[in-house]
């Protein structure tokens, strides 16, 4: 009786874990949901979405982006913050669009060069 009881507890625990994992992933993968992104979260998200595109363009021209060349003189956080701060679209900056107001990942991608 105790062996089957322990087996039942383990099976229920695993089932609960799988259900919780599946439920959580559905909500975190939805990039269409507008979200406020500020500070380092905004900078990290921007770099994650746009950094590869900037590198490819730099390789085609034979040079890297000037901001990324100065990385040795600036801390990584300061470089990300400066890059995100100066991005403009229709007179509105990335902070106004995605921090002051909620924005989607698709909207954030419009700031990629």
UniProtKB/Swiss-Prot annotation:
The modification 4-hydroxyproline is found at residues 34, 102. This venom insulin, from a fish-hunting cone snail, facilitates prey capture by rapidly inducing hypoglycemic shock. It is one of the smallest known insulin found in nature and lacks the C-terminal segment of the B chain that, in human insulin, mediates engagement of the insulin receptor (INSR) and assembly of the hormone's hexameric storage form. Despite lacking this segment, it both binds and activates human insulin receptor (long isoform (HIR-B)) with a high potency (EC(50)=242 nM). It is found in: Secreted. It is noteworthy that in this dimer, in contrast to Con-Ins G1, the chain B is amidated and not the chain A. SUPFAM superfamilies: Insulin-like. Its main location: secreted. GO terms for cellular component: extracellular region. Residues 22-29, 52-92 form a propeptide. Expressed by the venom gland. Heterodimer of A and B chains; disulfide-linked. One of its GO terms (biological process) is glucose metabolic process. This is Con-Ins G3. Residues 1-21 form the signal peptide. Disulfide bonds join 38-99, 50-112, 98-103. Venom insulins constitute about 1/25 of the total venom of C.geographus. Keywords: Amidation, Carbohydrate metabolism, Cleavage on pair of basic residues, Disulfide bond, Gamma-carboxyglutamic acid, Glucose metabolism, Hormone, Hydroxylation, Secreted, Signal, Toxin.
